[in-house]
């Protein structure tokens, strides 16, 4: 198995994504409506919006957990389905198996000599010394680091993050944001992060996309140097621009986003 540190240059580039005329309906309810989107290889994109707006549905379609009603999902010029081995998904819950040690959770599903790779992935997230402990010994933030290592061992070119930091305390959340940003800069994968936290979105993403009632309401480039200074005037101005757009929408309670059962071929961060 190729070491993470020995990947040839072409494996360090992310997947370019194209979404064309994408629609998703559940019965008579249309959740996504004619979404058109181009994401260059290696870009870090945050998707924000009110609950029920369709952002998690979009991520599920990109992850292959559901099928679009209409439209195309492309990796470059090829169907995105062709890139499933290069795609990993992280959820808000780490989904570690409690009866397997941490290193075995990282190598879950792999065959051959993978333990050195798993240790390397754990080192990348700062947990190599915890490799032979049980998941129960970890904090919530540490469990999410293991889930991230479980994604890294597969050398992803597309990393989909569905509110992975939502259950963490404020300080741990910032630390995880910084870790994800560091690893993204190191490995060059394309990232799509679904989050309710607008400040998180503008702090770590290249681009913030606001979904409004199933459509793209705002597509904002965050053209600021890294590392970004939290609390700076420029970051605050971008955050205010997104929040003002969100708060200008009618505030009626949304319906929850429907979902289909997880298919057996799901490739989350494992």
Swiss-Prot record:
GO MF annotation, one: ATP binding
InterPro entries the record matches: AAA+_ATPase (IPR003593), ABC_transporter-like_ATP-bd (IPR003439), ABC_transporter-like_CS (IPR017871), ABC_transporter_ATP-bind (IPR050166), P-loop_NTPase (IPR027417)
Listed transmembrane segments: none
Claim: Translocase is one of the keywords in the record: yes
Residue span(s) of domain ABC transporter: 17-238
PROSITE patterns, sorted: ABC_TRANSPORTER_1 (PS00211), ABC_TRANSPORTER_2 (PS50893), SSUB (PS51291)
Major enzyme class: translocase
Source superkingdom: Bacteria
Keyword terms of this UniProt record: ATP-binding, Cell inner membrane, Cell membrane, Membrane, Nucleotide-binding, Translocase, Transport
Binding site for ATP: 49-56
Broad class of the protein's primary localization: membrane
SUPFAM superfamilies: P-loop containing nucleoside triphosphate hydrolases
Known catalytic reactions: ATP + H2O + aliphatic sulfonate-[sulfonate-binding protein]Side 1 = ADP + phosphate + aliphatic sulfonateSide 2 + [sulfonate-binding protein]Side 1
Location in or out of the cell: Cell inner membrane
Membrane association type: Peripheral membrane protein
Entry EC no(s): 7.6.2.14
GO cellular component: plasma membrane
Xref: NCBIfam families: PRK11247.1
Family: Belongs to the ABC transporter superfamily. Aliphatic sulfonates importer (TC 3.A.1.17.2) family.
Subunit structure: The complex is composed of two ATP-binding proteins (SsuB), two transmembrane proteins (SsuC) and a solute-binding protein (SsuA).
Function comment: Part of the ABC transporter complex SsuABC involved in aliphatic sulfonates import. Responsible for energy coupling to the transport system.
UniProt protein name: Aliphatic sulfonates import ATP-binding protein SsuB 3
Species the sequence originates in: Pseudomonas syringae pv. syringae (strain B728a)
Organism taxonomic ancestry: Bacteria, Pseudomonadati, Pseudomonadota, Gammaproteobacteria, Pseudomonadales
